[in-house]
A protein has these predicted regions:
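Short helix/loop segment flanking the catalytic signature motif in cyclic-nucleotide metabolism enzymes
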Residues: 87, 114-131
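Conserved nucleotide-binding and Mg2+-coordinating catalytic segments in signaling enzymes
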Residues: 28-50, 67-81, 89
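Active-site-proximal alpha-helical element of nucleotidyl cyclase-like catalytic domains
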Residues: 83-102
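Signal-transducing coiled-coil linker helices
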Residues: 2-38, 46-57, 61-63, 107
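Catalytic-core segments of nucleotide cyclases and related cyclic-nucleotide turnover enzymes
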Residues: 77, 129, 142, 155-193
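Alpha-helical scaffold within the catalytic cores of cyclic-nucleotide enzymes
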Residues: 92-93, 124-141, 172
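A short pre-motif secondary-structure segment
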Residues: 104-107, 146
């Protein structure tokens, strides 16, 4: 009897462990779905809002990059939203491969992405220009190979200097200056003045 009771307790314990493991996996999947963009797999805006202060605290200096994909509306209108989605995914996958491991890529909204990087503005600008000029991201639309182009604005950040929303706004403004200057690239603070 005693052995049967022990075996039953062990079975109950094993079953409880399996249930807890499943529950932990379910919670982890939910957490991932809350932090990741479903289409691109990039971190999403909620994750940026949650992680950006910690990233900037852990990296005394670095860069915030605001990226806007060029021609996404045109691709959606002329070739369909499925191709527009593929355009976004292609960009995101290539950017993830081109970035440092410690850099974080976020899909901020629509065709807008943010990068938090421990690199100085000049370093990340070099990397972005290399992607645009020397090793562009190719995209196939119905057998036509096109380069994915984007405009960006970069601001430097230092620990405890400036609100995150202000940095995003400044990087966004620099990105629009970049677009209005026929895609001339704009870098660190003061470069646009």
């Amino acid at each position: 009897m005693y052995l049967e009771a022990l075996e039953q307790e062990k079975e109950n314990y094993d079953q409880m462990v399996r249930l807890l493991t499943r529950e932990e996996l379910r919670i982890e999947r939910l957490k991932t779905s809350m932090e990741r963009d479903a289409l691109t797999g990039c971190l999403n805006r909620a994750a940026f809002d949650h992680n950006s202060k910690r990233f900037m605290k852990n990296h005394k200096k670095g860069s915030l990059v605001f990226i806007d994909l060029d021609y996404l509306k045109l691709i959606n209108d002329c070739y369909g939203h499925e191709n527009g989605d593929r355009y976004l995914v292609c960009f995101a996958e290539n950017m993830k491969c081109a970035m440092d491991r410690q850099d974080l890529l976020y899909r901020y909204a629509g065709e807008e992405f943010l990068i938090l990087s421990a690199l100085e503005p000049e370093q990340i600008q070099e990397r972005l220009n290399e992607i645009l000029e020397k090793s562009p991201i190719h995209f196939d639309i119905n057998g036509e190979i096109r380069n994915i182009s984007f405009s960006y604005g970069i601001v430097a950040f230092e620990e405890k200097k400036g609100k995150i929303a202000d940095l995003v706004k400044e990087a966004d403004q620099r990105m629009y200056q970049c677009k209005s200057r026929n895609h001339e690239r704009i870098s660190k603070r003061g470069a646009a003045e």
